[in-house]
């Protein structure tokens, strides 16, 4: 297990900035106002060859109400999980009542805790930070997270005890590790072709605000991992959560809700939307959550379009299905059939994230979609299916000539890409292209993922070439012309 370092403190003391600095990413949203971070956010960092996990948390100040109470609970859970707690304070503001309350809580925990005074650039750090010794948590460590000052010294002083413990543990188990390495090397050659299959499946849960994405995430995990509150825009960042189900690894991505562009004016919401779109591009399977009571909206269709253009596999979950009468359910199903007819390959589930109804069957469709997207298909199989499709329904005539499909092969996967070579293939009507796509989908039993077919037309080998006449041919032409003139 990698050691865990939790970053805690009041709002707006620089926890997310330090998180980004330690993980060398820009995963955590950063803005100059309090309360931006809400859920626990995990990242992996490396110092001097030693890897560790960093947890970014929401700010706590003791005056929480509403959704802030949920944020504080997430921060307290992070403290319980951590091996080391970095308690961040603001060197410019000085010690506050909230700092004292957090320190009182930390002293009761059996954790290695270090006080980190941030924002020390441009001030006399020693004099400004002297009052923090009243917190009775030991030495005060000075840093400027936004500029990266003092970070290396902080890691040296805080990680050194933990590194010593890990080194002793590594020495105790080194002999056993050598045997395991030998066994791994023997099996690695045989299992190398399964490397892709062994990667965790990234599942992004997307949808409009307040449709139940975080509730569904917590239901799948069986714990209150992300904040759930009856208010649109509760989730602000994309939260990556590893999990295991039936001995298979997944990474759940809980994302912020996406509204229509004209309604998005807040800067933080704009960044949240960008994070959601990045999560769609980063994942393997997209789980679109739709509110049954609100019905399918144009914004849902926009999200679907972005997911399909990104080539992601797709599963649709209609949430809040419980409590609806049969008439309303039939009306909703008719609307879904009408508006989602263009993605008939995607599995549709009717669920209740709050009560767990139908949630267990989602992963059957997720696995099916992922396996379809990453399926390897031989060239012989693709060509045979192409020939069968032509035999059942010939390509149409274009300018009096029959379009000829000559050859097919795989052009990639995730999503499946099929390349078809032939004559006049660029002139094929869209109806025949859809026929080929559906024929391949049915023959290969591909569900849950789009299929992309690329048509390539053979170049004319004589295009642009000039017919060169030899000297003897020129003499014959002149003699023939002279003979015709004499006649």
Curated annotation (Swiss-Prot):
Residues annotated for GTP 2 binding in this entry: 207-214, 254-258, 319-322
SMART domains found in the cross-reference section: AAA
Residue ranges constituting the EngA-type G domain according to the UniProt record: 3-166, 201-374
One GO-annotated biological process of the protein: ribosome biogenesis
Entry annotated with the keyword Nucleotide-binding: yes
GO terms of molecular function: ATP hydrolysis activity; GTP binding; ribosome binding
PROSITE patterns linked: G_ENGA (PS51712)
Function comment: GTPase that plays an essential role in the late steps of ribosome biogenesis.
Record family assignment: Belongs to the TRAFAC class TrmE-Era-EngA-EngB-Septin-like GTPase superfamily. EngA (Der) GTPase family.
Entries under NCBIfam families matching the protein: GTPase_EngA, small_GTP
Name this protein carries in UniProt: GTPase Der
